[in-house]
Amino acid sequence: MQDVCNSQEILQDYAMELDRADVALLNAVQKNNRLTSEELADKVGLSPTACQRRLKRLRSLGVIEADVSIVSPKAVGRPVTMIVMVSLERERADIVDRFKSSIRNTREVMIGYYVTGDADFILIVTAKDMEEYEEFTRRFFYENHDIKGFKTMVVMDRVKATFAVPIEI
């Protein structure tokens, strides 16, 4: 995924070249990436071979970053979700890079954003219970001298969870 992040200029140029068939394919696979080539062909009006060729190109360009299943945290014993606002002690490139690396290497962090505003990072974290989250905060936040502070919001209800991006041409 690191390579995908480094190709933003290519993706921005490519976004201008998406045609209706690409958009239809992307919208279809964002909803269900288990559709067969024949089912995709019916939805977008192309042959199954053309659909596969286009999907391969979209993957190679990084437009499609991954083909994954979205797993319910609750179903696998991680029913507690937190949104955590993290502020760094100083905003220096080496500190930011070090914290980004720690986010990538920490299994409890599902999503991490480097942001502007009141915090430096927003994290989505899951835990099996609050005791496990407390242990995580001690290890991940309190033992890290680069962190000035953090604020936790506990999610009461997951109203919507999707990675589908609205696409228009």
UniProtKB/Swiss-Prot annotation:
One of its GO terms (cellular component) is cytosol. GO terms for molecular function: sequence-specific DNA binding. The keyword Transcription regulation applies. One of its GO terms (biological process) is response to amino acid. It holds the Pfam family HTH_24. InterPro entries: ArsR-like_HTH, AsnC-type_HTH_dom, Dimeric_a/b-barrel, Tscrpt_reg_AsnC-like, Tscrpt_reg_AsnC/Lrp_C, Tscrpt_reg_HTH_AsnC-type_CS, WH-like_DNA-bd_sf, WH_DNA-bd_sf. Keywords: DNA-binding, Plasmid, Transcription, Transcription regulation. Transmembrane segments: none annotated. Residues 37-56 bind DNA. Residues 18-79 form the HTH asnC-type domain. This is Uncharacterized HTH-type transcriptional regulator y4tD. It comes from Sinorhizobium fredii (strain NBRC 101917 / NGR234). The lineage of its organism: Bacteria, Pseudomonadati, Pseudomonadota, Alphaproteobacteria, Hyphomicrobiales.
